[in-house]
Amino acid sequence: MNQTLLSSFGTPFERVENALAALREGRGVMVLDDEDRENEGDMIFPAETMTVEQMALTIRHGSGIVCLCITEDRRKQLDLPMMVENNTSAYGTGFTVTIEAAEGVTTGVSAADRITTVRAAIADGAKPSDLNRPGHVFPLRAQAGGVLTRGGHTEATIDLMTLAGFKPAGVLCELTNDDGTMARAPECIEFANKHNMALVTIEDLVAYRQAHERKAS
């Protein structure tokens, strides 16, 4: 990732710390991956605190595929089958079947309905019957080990939520341009600045976690 482009957001470690602070303050974070991977920016929010307004922003400026990143334990708790048995997608993204809250929603499409679905899925005592399938929220199962195992937005979301002190569950959506093309780093940076979001790269998060785990050992 071009560090000159990112310099206004601080050093790699500062970017991670600023992202954690933003999440704790109820703000969103823009997460970029490498140019040689998806080369995309995802808006992420804590599943516990994301507001209807933030969901509306995400739907308006994102791909429309609003994803809920969860752990394997949560997937099992909710009895969510993986979307396919044989995942042949380029990066092995861990989609499960889609979901809708069983109660408290209308069509499930609105920002408010999607927030209701997210909250139902992450509730402490959530059970399979709390969700209908299919729906308009796309759960993503993160790999154990986070970004140190798989350098994806799903794992980055779970790692950031955990480091920020939230449940390991977060909402993500890819940022798109007004013409429908995918937003790249310059557009993601502009969007983050405009909407008071922190910005961090998956590479930053990998280095941060490796450094902290070396200290711990």
UniProtKB/Swiss-Prot annotation:
- Kindly list the GO CC terms recorded for this protein: cytosol; plasma membrane
Database matches in SUPFAM superfamilies: YrdC/RibB
Q: What residues does the record give for site: Essential for catalytic activity? A: H136, E174
Biological process according to GO? riboflavin biosynthetic process
Q: What is the effect of changing D113S?
A: Reduces activity by 88%
Annotated localization: Cell membrane
What result is annotated for mutating D42S? Loss of activity
- What EC number(s) has UniProt assigned to this enzyme? 4.1.99.12
Main location as per UniProt: membrane
Q: Which GO terms describe its molecular function?
A: 3,4-dihydroxy-2-butanone-4-phosphate synthase activity; identical protein binding; magnesium ion binding; manganese ion binding; protein homodimerization activity
Query: Highest taxon of the source?
Result: Bacteria
Q: Does the keyword RNA-binding apply?
A: no
Copy the pathway line from the protein's UniProt record: Cofactor biosynthesis; riboflavin biosynthesis; 2-hydroxy-3-oxobutyl phosphate from D-ribulose 5-phosphate: step 1/1
Keywords recorded for this protein, A-Z: Cell membrane, Lyase, Magnesium, Manganese, Membrane, Metal-binding, Riboflavin biosynthesis, Stress response
Reported effect, E38S: Loss of activity
Enzymatic reactions? D-ribulose 5-phosphate = (2S)-2-hydroxy-3-oxobutyl phosphate + formate + H(+)
User: Under which name does UniProt file this protein?
Assistant: 3,4-dihydroxy-2-butanone 4-phosphate synthase
Organism of derivation? Escherichia coli (strain K12)
